[in-house]
């Protein structure tokens, strides 16, 4: 047996034993694990952003454990088992890659990715975008799916023009009203347009913003270290001086 399969079988055996013998593991449910799984995914994301392959290995292991855990609970309930889940995704991969697994004609003229998704029974191209995704990732995924069927800017200049149009609308709204809902709506349109512009340019907006978040954290924490007293006690000019110093030293 391949080492990968041996390791996977070992994990499934351990989870099944823990479900029988460990007080904590015995009482877990789909619902109780859900938020912990979300946390694990974010921890994995951190290792990718921070380029930490050893930590990534650990987090992938934790995530595998969660996946097997869910499958073990499902098996106990008579819903499905881990082999059903794995075979299901295998069938999905084969169906979604007709250019590799299809007939001769399908290999020559494969349908688009979104056409394949619709053939699976989805009523909308956007059905595969989870409602619970963070707003920026959701916007990006909806735009990518719409672009997959041709609903897309022809070039980056048009996407840029849309950004400027939305920016002007924000400015107009700020000058003519104090209706916070309307202002918020216009900012949402501007953010959506910025995400579209970045996407057209080949920039992942989520990754771009995360890099800026990390840069801000690094510089702000240097400000805190360099301050001669608690940072909340400093005035605006002192804060700006510390910020510029941190900015110059952390480029």
Predicted regions and their residues:
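Flexible "arm" and connector segments at domain edges
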Residues: 1-59, 65-187, 191-251
């Amino acid at each position: 047996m391949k080492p990968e399969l041996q390791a996977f079988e070992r994990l499934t055996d351990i989870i099944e034993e823990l479900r029988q013998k460990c007080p904590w593991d015995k009482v877990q449910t789909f619902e109780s694990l859900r938020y912990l799984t979300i946390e694990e995914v974010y921890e994995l994301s951190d290792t990718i952003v921070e380029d930490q392959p050893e930590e990534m290995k650990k987090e992938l292991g934790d995530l595998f454990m969660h996946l097997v855990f869910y499958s073990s609970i499902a098996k106990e309930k008579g819903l499905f088992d881990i082999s059903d889940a794995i075979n299901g995704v295998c069938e999905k991969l084969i169906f979604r890659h007709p250019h590799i697994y299809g007939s001769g004609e399908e290999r020559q003229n494969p349908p688009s990715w979104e056409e394949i998704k619709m053939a699976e029974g989805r009523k909308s191209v956007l059905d595969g975008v989870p409602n619970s995704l963070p707003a920026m990732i959701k916007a990006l995924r909806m735009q990518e799916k719409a672009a997959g069927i041709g609903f897309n800017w022809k070039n980056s200049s048009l996407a840029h023009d849309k950004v400027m149009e939305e920016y002007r609308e924000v400015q107009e709204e700020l000058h003519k009203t104090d209706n916070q809902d309307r202002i918020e709506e216009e900012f949402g349109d501007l953010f959506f347009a910025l995400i579209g512009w970045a996407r057209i340019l080949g920039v992942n907006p989520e990754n771009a913003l995360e890099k800026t978040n990390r840069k801000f954290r690094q510089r702000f924490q240097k400000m805190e270290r360099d301050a001669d007293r608690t940072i909340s006690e400093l005035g605006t000019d002192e804060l700006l001086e510390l910020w510029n110093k941190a900015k110059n030293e952390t480029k």
